[in-house]
Amino acid sequence: MNILDGIKSLALKLGSKQDQTYYARGLSLTDDLMQIEALWRDNWIANKVCIKRSEDMVRNWRDIFSNDLKSEQLDEFTKLERRLKLRETLTKALQWSSLYGAVGLLVVTDTINITSPLQPTERLKRLIILPKWKISPTGQRDDDVFSPNFGRYSEYTITGGTQSVSVHHSRLLIINANDAPLSDNDIWGVSDLEKIIDVLKRFDSASANVGDLIFESKIDIFKIAGLSDKISAGLENDVAHVISAVQSIKSATNSLLLDAENEYDRKELSFGGLKDLLTEFRNAVAGAADMPVTILFGQSVSGLASGDEDIQNYHESIHRLQETRLRPVLEVLDTLLCNELFGGQPDDWWFEFLPLTVVKQEQQVNMLNTFATAANTLIQNGVVNEYQVANELRESGLFANISADDIEEMKNANELARNFEEPEGESTQVQASEDE
């Protein structure tokens, strides 16, 4: 017979050894479509997390470079992008991908047979955003590790209404927000809201509780003689009527009428510490969303911090998302657009996303002075030439109006001037030899 000397609670497990904290996998928010859409409709923080970062990824767009093309040809490429509304479509695709975890982007061209591989010679007409629940993998999974489609399927079925069509994998661009764990072996990503849902619930609960406390910040206390006896006698309505009349008189005349044996008192709640508590919950949400408090909540930085470092970290985070989510899509589309305009994509074609950081005019002047001093020293020592300096100025953004054609014209003008100078030097040498 064993006798336990102590207190043991089945509810609180007092007196028994507690297990260590561990993470257990439950129902994924990404798979809970109803809760995700409820967050989208009702929670402004979740809405902003999905929208703000998607808009920032395409806000300044990109710079396109190619030494084989003239500036007018690059301008034609930009006009074609606008005509196809690539930025608007990709903004929406990134937004829904952030919310649902993944979306499909159907590349619609001038070809009819969409079960065949996408060819560079096809002409792009538009892009259609498809939710992942309308896409079903039906082909064979690619097990070739050397294939660019490794781990994905060769064919997909798109369901719309009562009809369904099959499409080759090259015509369906899948944009994932976050990669699923490798053990899932899934082609679909994980929602951006997955990592903030727990801290978001705590912040919402704390905010709601503080809001409820406001209505109880001041409590009127009436001490009525024989209150219990009156309630026992069934006179609750009479007591309530008296209290209502007293409060009405107090509200109208700012005076209080009570019987001599009754008393009145008021209690006020203290909200000390609640602000700091809400601030900590708010910071946890911003940290989980990988967004500064100034951007996510629209509040200024407190204390001695300027907030510039937080903004810089956010811009670096946006650039990382551009490289992982946006660049793979644009690399496929650029092949089609270049072939339509130039008959093929140039070998030296590349692009860079423009930074979100805006350099102040004073900082730009200081940077330009420093650059000019260093460039002048390098030119005098023969390390670089004027054309390399001009190219560096153009790529750094310090002189945004310098084009590739301007640099080429400067180079041609210098070569022409050098050609005029060389004969003069030769004639001088001939004259000198004759004098000797």
UniProtKB/Swiss-Prot annotation:
Q: Which domain of life is it from?
A: Bacteria
Q: What is this protein called?
A: Uncharacterized protein HI_1409
